[in-house]
Swiss-Prot record:
Top-tier EC class: ligase
Biological process according to GO: 'de novo' IMP biosynthetic process
Record's protein name: N5-carboxyaminoimidazole ribonucleotide synthase
Record key words, sorted: ATP-binding, Ligase, Nucleotide-binding, Purine biosynthesis
Gene encoding the protein: purK
Gene3D superfamilies xrefs: 3.40.50.20, ATP-grasp fold, A domain, ATP-grasp fold, B domain
UniProt cross-references to InterPro entries, sorted A to Z: ATP-grasp (IPR011761), ATP-grasp_carboxylate-amine (IPR003135), ATP_grasp_subdomain_1 (IPR013815), PreATP-grasp_dom_sf (IPR016185), PurK (IPR005875), PurK_C (IPR040686), PurT/PurK_preATP-grasp (IPR054350), Rudment_hybrid_motif (IPR011054)
């Protein structure tokens, strides 16, 4: 079985690693260079996209911001999973919000903005504070503004106006500000015949809009809510593959914040913490194979490595620590890799996070230090 991944970053890399034991060969399309490359070595392979489409059995995607002509070309082959519709919804907040409404899953109240009058109407309808998000191209906290006070309206509008003028296809989604208790996410998979499996919820900690720490949690009531919402969205799309839903938890109730039609950063913990990791289950789903068990096998936390290309030796020396590097050139704030920390029980996992806080730099790993201070104030 041969799979073409649209995108050639770390998610394609980890899909390739997960596919090898199943005798699934992966190649990747680098959207920037428009080359077909090997996902691990980045070696350029000697054929173009159209030839690659003909030579593979399945096409999938590692991220949602793929040019629509490329998605449409792949969709015409009948080999693209998830569908172009699903991938496009993940890359456009207007489509995403419409999808959530059709699926009848709870999400923050919103309206669309293209003009100063639209902003005035949005403030009257939703009230302040509000969060303003770009419809296209926003991820990891980019393309977002927070409007808290009436005195900010003109200055924020000036920024929005410049942003909109630079891209005629752009729009702004105005959402009510949600005072959430915590952020959680659910990663699951749906296959060609409609079977669904979901992993345990993960509690997520973000730093400046970027995921820093993700921990698998046992929350039965929330898990039931999240699974029902996952199924509603997946069935609305007739989805095939791994799908992630990010939620705000507010007094025991969940609101969908975003969807990601792909394997997801908050699911990386499954590589060591679940019986079948998200990358393998994605390939199983899109290749027509039975889905694997999502059972938790060890208490697990995932720590993103941001902007660092080296770690202290003590990290690998700690029992239950697994490091995954992405092979990227070092750049400030860039996702360079992640650490999966596993333990037999939650208290042991907390102890290990505290140990890691003693050797990891607080500036680079603020979430680990914050958790350690909560555990051992």
């Amino acid at each position: 079985m041969r799979v073409l991944v649209l995108g050639a970053g770390q998610l394609a890399r980890m899909m390739s690693l997960a596919g090898a034991p199943l005798n699934i060969e992966t190649i990747a399309f680098d959207v920037g260079s428009e080359n077909i490359v090997h996902p691990l070595t980045q070696t350029v392979l000697g054929h173009g996209l159209e030839q690659a489409i003909e030579q593979v059995d399945v096409i999938t995607a590692e991220f949602e911001h793929i040019p629509h002509p490329i998605l449409d070309l792949c969709a015409r082959s009948g080999k693209l999973y998830p569908s172009a519709e699903a991938i496009k919804a993940g890359g456009d907040r207007r489509l995403e919000k419409a999808l959530l409404d059709r699926a009848q899953v709870a999400n923050a109240r919103y309206t669309m903005i293209r003009s100063r009058d639209d902003l005035t109407s949005a403030i009257a309808e939703i009230g302040l504070p509000m969060v303003l998000k770009s419809a296209l191209g926003g991820y990891d906290g980019k393309g977002q503004w927070r409007l808290k006070e009436p005195t900010q309206i003109e200055s924020v509008w000036q920024e929005l106006a410049q942003y909109l003028a630079a891209n005629p296809e752009q729009a702004i989604v105005a959402e009510e500000f949600v005072a959430f208790d915590r952020e959680v996410s659910l990663v699951g998979a749906r296959n060609l015949v409609g079977d669904v499996v979901v992993y345990p919820l993960a509690e997520n900690v973000h730093t400046q809009g970027v995921l820093s720490l993700s921990t698998a949690i046992d929350a039965p009531a929330l898990q039931t809510q999240a699974k029902a919402m996952f199924k509603a969205v997946a069935e609305q799309l007739n989805y095939v593959g791994v799908l992630a839903l990010e939620f705000f938890e507010v007094q025991g109730q969940l609101l969908v914040n975003e969807i990601a039609p792909r394997v997801h950063n908050s699911g990386h913990w499954t590589q060591q913490g679940a019986e079948t990791c998200q990358f393998e289950n994605h390939l199983r789903a899109v290749c027509g194979l039975p889905l694997g068990s999502t059972k938790l096998v060890r208490e697990t936390a995932m720590i993103n490595i941001l902007g660092e290309d080296q770690l202290p030796a003590e990290v690998l020396a700690l029992e239950g620590c697994h490091v995954h590097w992405y092979g990227k050139a070092k750049r400030s704030g860039r996702k360079m890799g992640h650490i999966n920390v596993t333990a037999d029980y939650s208290g042991e996992l907390q102890r290990k996070l505290c140990q890691l806080a003693t050797v990891l730099d607080e500036k680079a790993f603020p979430a680990v230090h914050a958790v350690a201070k909560e555990i051992q104030p």
